[in-house]
């Protein structure tokens, strides 16, 4: 299992759920999830993207199941992934007609590791309870867990209207925003209670309550966490593109995780046109790793640069090493157990360079502006070499690779511990 640190505070106690062999809740490490954006009926494209997400570190992948062609493709996607040695659990994302698709395509129902149900659009009026029941009964039949995923963009309007009407009769009515938050929480809890009444075990239910506002997300999940002990999936829906989406998701989920709330997360980023879908996995890992909850890839500490570091050498070296470490992690996780705990320092001048490098497992202090063109390298806190000339970057990269082999390879120091 990927390394992780103990939470520095009590985590919320939740009921553990097995999702295709991945433990969610019950004290297990926070799980990183992702979702494809391919047409699921396009088997080649979907298999390729699931494989890429899994290689990037996604531990559960959700796929859209929106029509017969998609449902028919699911078992073939699962089979292809198995042949490739990719055992990542697949979650079926169902809206509107999930009850029909699961009934008409039993092979799909069996191939999926979990079903996502949206109580806001599982059915309407007199069909709602019946169609919700149909999906839950399919989950029971195939021994699958479900995520009851409430989203304020498709919130149960009957429930919201009733709560709004009740609120008007109060002496001190809540704001519309507060009522909406309460409707989201109630939708999740009432749906979970109904699923249990149908016969689904508590260890088969995960809840989520997604909104697009940071303060709304914090308020909704804080309330949900106090009123339910079901495992919780965190996500800020419609977070947006680029740095805006990253900052918003990290701000909201960071606060919740720090309070011990959250058993699995997804960073929902709007990708650039033809952008890399694995970016959301990387950001989720970096959030958990930065907060000290899990360790996925070696840390590269690098200074931000200042007037003493007019050269771009240290920036390029830090970027190259970080990219190389992440690229090799799918293989290194198996080949070098524990390598995710490695810390590398790439510093740009003499002010903090030697000290930061000594704190790392292996670090280099490159010369700043006007400094002697030499670069001391520190290994395990001690000066191990001084690099000179035009090949400093290449020489250090080789030293990092050699250090990993010596420390984490078979017969290495870490393997012997």
From Swiss-Prot:
Q: In which pathway does it act?
A: Isoprenoid biosynthesis; isopentenyl diphosphate biosynthesis via DXP pathway; isopentenyl diphosphate from 1-deoxy-D-xylulose 5-phosphate: step 5/6
**Single GO BP term:** terpenoid biosynthetic process
Q: Which domain of life is it from?
A: Bacteria
Q: What is the main EC category here?
A: oxidoreductase
Catalytic reaction list: (2E)-4-hydroxy-3-methylbut-2-enyl diphosphate + oxidized [flavodoxin] + H2O + 2 H(+) = 2-C-methyl-D-erythritol 2,4-cyclic diphosphate + reduced [flavodoxin]
Q: Does the keyword ATP-binding apply?
A: no
Q: What is its EC number?
A: 1.17.7.3
Q: How is the cofactor bound?
A: Binds 1 [4Fe-4S] cluster.
SUPFAM superfamilies to which the protein is assigned, alphabetical: Nitrite and sulphite reductase 4Fe-4S domain-like (SSF56014)
Matching InterPro entries? Dihydropteroate_synth-like_sf, IspG_bac, IspG_bac-typ, NO2/SO3_Rdtase_4Fe4S_sf
Q: Which prosthetic group or cofactor does it need?
A: [4Fe-4S] cluster
Q: Which GO terms describe its molecular function?
A: 4 iron, 4 sulfur cluster binding; 4-hydroxy-3-methylbut-2-en-1-yl diphosphate synthase activity (ferredoxin); 4-hydroxy-3-methylbut-2-enyl-diphosphate synthase activity (flavodoxin); iron ion binding
- Is Nucleus tagged as a keyword? no
NCBIfam families under this entry? ispG_gcpE, PRK00366.1
UniProt record similarity statement: Belongs to the IspG family.
Function comment: Converts 2C-methyl-D-erythritol 2,4-cyclodiphosphate (ME-2,4cPP) into 1-hydroxy-2-methyl-2-(E)-butenyl 4-diphosphate.
Q: What is this protein called?
A: 4-hydroxy-3-methylbut-2-en-1-yl diphosphate synthase (flavodoxin)
């Amino acid at each position: 299992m990927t390394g992780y640190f103990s939470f520095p505070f009590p985590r919320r106690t939740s009921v553990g759920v097995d999702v295709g062999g991945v433990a969610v809740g019950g004290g297990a490490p926070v799980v990183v999830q992702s979702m494809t954006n391919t047409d699921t009926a396009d088997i080649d494209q979907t298999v390729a993207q699931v494989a890429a997400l899994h290689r990037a570190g996604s531990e559960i992948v959700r796929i859209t199941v929106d029509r017969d062609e998609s449902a028919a493709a699911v078992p073939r996607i699962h089979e292809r992934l198995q042949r490739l040695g990719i055992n990542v659990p697949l979650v079926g994302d169902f809206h509107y007609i999930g009850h029909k698709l699961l009934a008409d395509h039993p092979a799909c129902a069996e191939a999926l590791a979990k079903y996502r149900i949206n109580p806001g659009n599982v059915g309407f009026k007199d069909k709602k309870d019946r169609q919700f029941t149909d999906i839950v009964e399919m989950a029971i039949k195939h021994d699958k867990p479900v995520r009851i995923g409430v989203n304020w963009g498709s919130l149960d309007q009957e429930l919201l209207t009733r709560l709004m009407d009740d609120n008007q009769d109060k002496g001190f009515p809540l704001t519309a925003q507060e009522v909406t938050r309460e409707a989201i929480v109630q939708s999740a809890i009432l749906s979970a209670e109904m699923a249990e009444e149908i016969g689904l075990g508590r260890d088969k239910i995960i809840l989520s309550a997604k909104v697009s506002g940071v303060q709304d997300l914090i308020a909704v999940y804080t309330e949900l966490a106090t009123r339910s002990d079901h495992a919780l999936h965190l996500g800020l829906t419609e977070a947006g593109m680029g740095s805006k989406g990253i900052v918003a998701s990290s701000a909201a989920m960071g606060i919740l995780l720090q309070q011990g709330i959250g058993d699995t997360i997804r960073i929902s980023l709007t990708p650039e046109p033809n952008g890399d879908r694995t970016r959301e996995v990387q950001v989720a890992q970096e959030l958990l790793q930065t907060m000290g909850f899990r360790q996925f890839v070696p840390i590269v500490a690098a200074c931000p640069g200042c007037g003493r570091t007019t050269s771009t050498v240290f920036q390029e070296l830090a970027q190259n090493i970080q990219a190389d470490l992440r690229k090799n992690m799918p293989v290194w996780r198996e080949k070098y157990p524990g390598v995710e705990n490695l810390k590398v320092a790439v510093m740009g001048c003499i002010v903090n360079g030697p000290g930061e490098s000594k704190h790392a497992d292996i670090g280099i202090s490159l010369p700043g502006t006007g400094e002697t063109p030499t670069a001391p390298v520190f290994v395990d806190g001690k000066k191990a070499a001084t690099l000179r000339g035009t090949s400093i970057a290449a020489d250090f990269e080789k030293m990092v690779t050699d250090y990993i082999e010596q420390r984490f390879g078979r017969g290495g120091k870490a393997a012997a511990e």
